[in-house]
Amino acid sequence: TFVVRVRKVKDFAPNLISMKLEQKLGELILNKVKEAKVNLHTPEKTFFGVITQDKFVFGLKAAEILPKPFVERRPRRRPFFHPSAVQAKLARCMVNLAQPKEDDLVVDPFCGTASMLIEAGLIGCRVMGSDVRKQMIYGSLENLSHFGIEPEGMILADAKHLPIVSADCIVTDPPYGRSATTLGWSTRRIVEKFLSNACDVIPNRRRICMASPKSIRISSIGEEFGFRHLESHFVYVHRSLTREITVLEKI
């Protein structure tokens, strides 16, 4: 048994009705596989399609992540809260973009409240973090413990001078915006200094996923320091801030 589901991203293909496309695709599958039957409620297989700009992505759903656990890990639900904390779903997205393997060491040099480390730890990675503020180190330890994650270490250190010699990948969100502390440095200078050191820490063909204001143009900074820019995604926060989520690969 099977079902076909189609979703639109934003307002792309406004004249296309998702339900009609689901029906047409279902008919094609029924014509190809004679023993197949439609089951809208408890199907054995779910075919899933996404309509986006100039593309239709279609395939068989292999797994599903329920939204409730992400809600339960929202920053305000954690023991230690700070307004600059990254939401759990975005943190998991960034960890996934860095493509760590199980038991890899994932490092966040600007760990804040440990959003990235929590998500990496929950998928079986070893984690280590650092922050220039003692309050954040203690808060991160509290949050990690709350989710049953034991870090390899938490270091009070300035990420402009990385306190580690190696990591399998880095996932991080440097300070910027209204609630963050930059200790008098511009965000661009912080990113430049961090990336100049990070190129000596991760192996070739491994990744850094980091966020920054769109205006910083982090992809071009990464290329200056020996990284290949793989992809960028933009997240609107408010009128004066759009985040660029950038994936860089060491070459």
Give the residues covered by each predicted segment.
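Class I S-adenosyl-L-methionine-dependent methyltransferase catalytic core
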Residues: 9-16, 20-23, 35, 42-251
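Short secondary-structure capping/junction motifs at helix and strand boundaries
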Residues: 1, 30-42
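Residues that mark the start of a beta-strand
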Residues: 1-3, 105
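Active-site nucleophile-His-acid catalytic modules used for acyl/amide transfer and hydrolysis
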Residues: 5-7
